[in-house]
């Protein structure tokens, strides 16, 4: 399935449809925003765990992206940033393992892998970061091209690829 966050489906909606209680989620994304979390928080609170690999080498020096993108003005105007940040922090503390890609390694796309007990798995690969624009919630002029697969063999292959990167200590750090 092709997902463009406009006419051909939205990454956030596809994730919501596949996230189940006790799902295991594995994500590679340049960054992660609290407003992206807010949009999926109902589903994310029910999952078992998340492995989150951030690929933007500058994220440790400049964490401002955590508080949203330029398109997130409507969220910032609600003045509930502190509440959302606290909720996100608590959720990450309970459910997440977070690692970062080494700054010398270039990774130019994002992946989302959902493992469910009933093998109703999903994998999405493309250029949608974990943000409101990347999830297709907030309108943007950016172009997104993502592919979602649900067949067992493809989801297994993409998850295996994620795990190879996740466990590679030469390019990934805690």
Residue spans for each PLM region:
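PLD/PLD-like phosphodiesterase catalytic module centered on the HKD motif
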Residues: 1-174
């Amino acid at each position: 399935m092709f997902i463009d966050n406009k006419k051909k489906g939205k990454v956030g909606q596809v994730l919501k449809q596949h996230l189940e209680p006790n799902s295991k989620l594995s994500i590679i994304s340049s960054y992660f925003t609290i407003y992206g979390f807010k949009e999926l928080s109902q589903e994310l609170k029910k999952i078992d765990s998340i492995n989150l690999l951030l690929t933007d080498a500058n994220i440790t020096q400049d964490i401002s992206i955590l508080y949203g993108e330029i398109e997130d003005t409507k969220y910032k105007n609600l003045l509930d940033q502190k509440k959302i940040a606290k909720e996100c922090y608590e959720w990450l503390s309970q459910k997440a393992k977070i690692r970062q890609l080494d700054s010398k390694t270039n990774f130019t796309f994002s992946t989302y892998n959902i493992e469910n007990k009933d093998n109703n798995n999903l994998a999405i690969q493309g250029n949608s970061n974990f943000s409101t624009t990347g999830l297709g919630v907030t309108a943007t002029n950016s172009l997104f091209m993502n592919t979602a697969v649900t067949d067992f063999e493809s989801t297994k292959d993409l998850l295996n690829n994620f795990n190879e990167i996740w466990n590679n200590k030469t390019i990934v750090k805690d």
